[in-house]
Amino acid sequence: MPAPLETCISDLDCSSSNSSSDLSSFLTDEEDCARLQPLASTSGLSVPARRSAPALSGASNVPGAQDEEQERRRRRGRARVRSEALLHSLRRSRRVKANDRERNRMHNLNAALDALRSVLPSFPDDTKLTKIETLRFAYNYIWALAETLRLADQGLPGGSARERLLPPQCVPCLPGPPSPASDTESWGSGAAASPCATVASPLSDPSSPSASEDFTYGPGDPLFSFPGLPKDLLHTTPCFIPYH
């Protein structure tokens, strides 16, 4: 009988060991669960915290971004205002410089015309020549002086010299030798010129640019007469190439 008893005791020991192992395993599972629960709670709290952290940082950065954007806009507005003011000042300075240049140019032109009038034959005090009239008168005066010098160098009589100087179509228009009395009357009254002078004169040509200005100052012959020069030569001067 001792053998079956020993076997029973051994069976009981095995069963008790098995139950204790089961209990130990159960307890270890409970302990693991108890340990896992705090870990899960801490991890669950940490994950939303991590997720909410960028949101909080973004919310905190929104006012800073708005401030930076406003500052940039202010800087741009200031730059635009400065650039517009600078452009306005540059345009104004350029306009002032252009006006100064134009004023200086007109002053120089008027001074040159006054100097030219000072060397031309004198006119009555109430006579005022325009710019184009002054230039044409100076051109004709220079031409008359040059022809007078050429005639004096050649030593030819006045009539034959005129016939040699004038083109053939103007020779029949030459007047005869005037008497001293008629010459004096013509100087005082301003007699009409020859047909060639009437047709080709740049001073009385209606097609000239300053014809309207030339006609406003009365007859052309006494105005553009040259004292000390033969009057017939002056009447025939328009037969040369017109001044343009």
Swiss-Prot record:
GO molecular-function term, one example from the UniProt record: E-box binding
Signal peptide (from-to): none
Main localization, broad class: nucleus
GO cellular component: neuronal cell body; nucleus; perikaryon
Tissue specificity of this protein: Expression restricted to the embryonic nervous system.
UniProt keyword Metal-binding, yes or no: no
Limits of the bHLH domain: 93-145
CDD domains for the chain: bHLH_TS_NGN1_NeuroD3
Disulphide bridges, residue numbers: none
Listed GO biological process terms: auditory behavior; cell fate commitment; cochlea morphogenesis; craniofacial suture morphogenesis; exit from mitosis; genitalia morphogenesis; hard palate morphogenesis; inner ear morphogenesis
SMART domains the UniProt entry points to: HLH (SM00353)
Keywords tagged on the record: Activator, Developmental protein, Differentiation, DNA-binding, Neurogenesis, Nucleus, Transcription, Transcription regulation
Function: Acts as a transcriptional regulator. Involved in the initiation of neuronal differentiation. Activates transcription by binding to the E box (5'-CANNTG-3'). Associates with chromatin to enhancer regulatory elements in genes encoding key transcriptional regulators of neurogenesis.
Protein name (database record): Neurogenin-1
